[in-house]
Amino acid sequence: MKTKLFLSQLVALVVVAAIFYASYGATNALASACANVPEIYFAWERAVPFWAWSIVPYWSLNLLYALGFFLCRNSRELARYVTQLLAAQIIATLFFIVFPLQMSWEKPAVSGLSGFLFSSLAAFDLPFNQAPSLHIILCVVVGAFYLRKARAVWLKVALVAWFALIGLSVLTTYQHHFIDIPTGLAAGCFVLLVRPMDGEPLRFAMATETARYKWAALYLGLAFLTLFAAITGAKIWSSWALWLSWASLSFALVACGYAFFGAGVFAKNGQGRHVAAAKALLFPYLCIARLNAFFWLRGRRLSDEILPGLYLGSVKQAGKFDAVLDCAAEFERPDGAQIYASLPMLDMITPSVDELKRGADELEWLVKTTLCVGENLPQMAAKLGSNFSAKAGYANGRDLKFRRQADARANLQTSGAANESEIGAAKQIFANSNGRTAETNGKKLLVCCALGYGRSASVLLAWMVIYRGFGFDDALNLLKSRREKIAVSSSLRERIERLAVRTSEI
């Protein structure tokens, strides 16, 4: 078995290396045949020193790249590593062909080991293939591979320091200009996002709902607007304006999420955390999402009790509850909840029937797990794990496919509001159906999204109808009487009622 794996590793290395040198050489040749190849750099880069010794860490990436093949523990890990490297090569090659750039600065004469390494590099390299820096892309991909394997803290620190030195060396060896570095970092993070080493890869699936394309168009428009502002600002004001292109990239990725990838573009894992690659790429959008939540929630209650022990509210309150069902894709969970389930959904989109079913199932399990007398919550959390449901969230990398076309988003109007007798009756229904309520054990469960008005309310409505026998209007009236600003789409009733029928037939 080990011999077979070793042969697979060796063959993979030979094939990937051949593709690397063939494609890299081809794009260099194409660029050298062009009459005028542009060069982009900042004036301050003239002050960057040439450190001949930094060719050693620069070259070390080649060794680490190759060694990684033989550190893969099985064929699955080897396949993931190979596909990451090939994805990096494809992305870089496409940019080298479409946007050829050069680095024209002459290197000082160097002797000794550094001179030998520079001469070896010059044997196959030309001053082209600049942005995004393939060296930086591979630094991200290969670095993530090694960090994943490191266990000791000191080793992780040493690896981060060494790979940072590799990244710096592209400047101090006069191999690249600065602009090649952030573009390379972005491309490397994108590779890790679409093809992670753990979990399922990002799934491509065309959205079937008009609402998702409308939001995709909005974010794509914001992407173009911020890109225009970045370029224009750099021309008439300062090169610092180019950092707006980071926001442009984040908006473009969110647009792709609405149109193709679903909530998986946020890569929120079962512990309620965004993976590092997604966090880096989407950072500007995530900051804006938090500002937006702050704006809409200012002066308002962050959560409200709907039924005894069962609350609806913002994910910002999640740390104060014993158990949480989190429906927000764009927010990370606060620390605190002992039992946590993640079911990420896109904002401003009506949950699909499948999402509603999974959300209702998760909530029912949380109710039975949390809102009952005599259970030791920490022990229960330990038995279940921090994400007890194998069905929930991005932990298993599943992108939910939306199957029906949604109507325009609007508040669903129903006649009347729940009066006190209806609320009392609702409490009794909950108490009778659950047997032992949270009133007797003091435990609290939160169903949440960004604001606690849309996605989480939809899931709670589905649970009340399917598992607690509420009529849709009664459930909605109860929610609106307890938490203002509830906003659900006009198509939600049909989806929940269809789900209730489907559930009753099982």
Where are the model-predicted features located?
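N-terminal transmembrane-helix/juxtamembrane module of multi-pass inner/ER membrane proteins
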Residues: 1-64, 108-109, 118, 262-274
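Cysteine-based protein phosphatase catalytic domain of the PTP/DSP
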Residues: 114-121, 295-371, 431, 435-447, ...
